[in-house]
Regions:
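N-terminal phosphate-binding or glycine-rich loops at protein starts, especially the Walker A/P-loop
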Residues: 5-52
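Phosphate/nucleotide-donor binding subsite
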Residues: 60-104
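Glycine-rich phosphate/diphosphate-binding loop of Rossmann-like nucleotide-binding domains
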Residues: 24-25, 37, 41-43, 49, ...
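Short glycine/serine/threonine-rich phosphate/pyrophosphate-binding segments
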Residues: 22-26, 89-102, 106-120, 127, ...
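Solvent-exposed alpha-helices and their adjacent loops that cap or buttress functional pockets
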Residues: 3-8, 15, 35-36, 59-60, ...
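Glycine-rich phosphate/nucleotide-binding loop
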Residues: 121-134, 138-148, 228-232, 236-346
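Short beta-strand segments
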Residues: 15, 44-46, 68, 109-111, ...
Length: 348
């Protein structure tokens, strides 16, 4: 499976029953993805009647979408480990097993984050040598975007884990986003090397002495939106706080701007003049454009989208899998982590 993506299509197993807007928005996103790209085939895993009812309203290439039956759904509130073990016919478990078996190359879900993270490791499995697979979403910055790694998978990370995060994040930004020699920073409470908690203090010299990444030192949270670094390294608790703050501030800002523009006749007239520029700017800070967060370091690509995902984010998450395939990210991660001998063995 680690030598994946050899078929005519990049095959993506999509959890059709996961998320607040399933199956409607999930199916719509899948249709939009195949209508936009002839390189992808989607396996919609879910309750057939519900999925096929949604599909009936769309026009698409029938060869590019397949419905894979699943009779169960893992709810967000369920304990992830227990749910993965007990609900073998759930849309999440069946979709992940499609990746494990090699029938599909990638997995996308807006469903239970815990079940996806647990299932990714237990079912799909880690690349040999990867200590902890991180969840790594793209976040908007003044200069484009940055990769936030980790944002939810490893709360109790070790220094060696963060070093691997930095390397995997560098591979992703360079090959998927086209950033040459991406700048790597570790989240800290100050720019000085001696600052930070025990984890940061222990990790800093390891990153500093790592020859195959462009480590620029500590990055404070306020400098992340300015684009100070391309790869934002942190353990999952810190990363999740950063991500949720990003989302919350963005929503609040949009509400405040809209309220201000409608507060008087003068502001309404002014709003008409600035609307095109404002709309363009706000679009740059829309997280949906990037799709979901990849879980790097697994044998197959696992992508987790927001639970509230609409069709556009699902579509972009599916299309993200094509770039992952074409750029051979897993092979490059192995190279970055010093696993050239593993690649040679698999090529025999």
């Amino acid at each position: 499976m680690e030598g994946m993506f050899m078929s005519e299509y990049v095959k993506v197993a999509v959890d059709a029953m996961g998320g607040d807007n399933a199956p409607g928005e999930i199916v719509k996103g899948a249709v939009e993805a195949v209508n936009e790209s002839s390189k992808v085939k989607v396996c919609l895993v879910g309750i057939p009647d519900a999925v096929e009812k949604e599909l009936a309203g769309y026009t698409y290439n029938k060869e590019q979408i397949e419905v894979v039956p699943a009779s169960e759904v893992i709810e967000t509130a369920e304990p992830p480990v227990m749910a993965i073990r007990k609900k073998k016919d759930s849309s999440i478990v069946k979709a992940l097993n499609l990746v494990k078996s090699g029938e599909c190359d990638a997995y996308v879900s807006a469903g239970s984050t815990g079940a996806t993270l647990v299932g990714g490791q237990v079912i799909v499995g880690r690349i040999k040598g990867v200590e902890r697979p991180p969840l790594a979403p793209l976040i908007p910055t003044e200069k484009g975007c940055a990769l936030l790694i980790d944002c939810g998978a490893n709360v109790d990370a070790r220094p060696s884990h963060l070093v691997q995060f930095a390397k995997m994040g560098s591979v992703y930004m360079e090959n998927i986003m086209g950033v040459k020699n991406p700048k790597v920073g570790i989240v800290n409470i100050g720019a000085e090397e001696e600052k930070g908690n025990a984890l940061v203090k222990e990790t800093f010299p390891l990153l500093k002495n790592c020859p195959d990444i462009n480590f620029v030192g500590s990055v404070e949270a306020r400098d992340i939106p300015a684009g100070a670094v391309d790869v934002v390294v942190c353990e999952a608790f810190v990363g999740n706080v950063i991500l949720k703050t990003y989302e919350g501030v963005g929503l609040t800002l949009i509400k405040k701007v809209k309220a201000g523009m409608m507060s008087s006749l003068r502001s309404k007239v002014g709003a008409l003049l600035v609307k095109p520029a404002l709309k363009s700017t706000l679009k740059e800070f829309d997280l949906e454009q990037y799709g979901g967060a990849p879980m790097l370091g697994l044998k197959g690509l696992v992508v987790k989208t927001h639970g509230s995902s609409k069709a556009n984010e699902i579509k972009n998450s599916i299309l993200q899998c094509i770039a992952f395939s074409e750029q051979k990210i897993n092979e490059k991660i192995k190279e970055k982590l010093g696993m050239e001998e593993l690649i040679a063995d698999e090529a025999k």
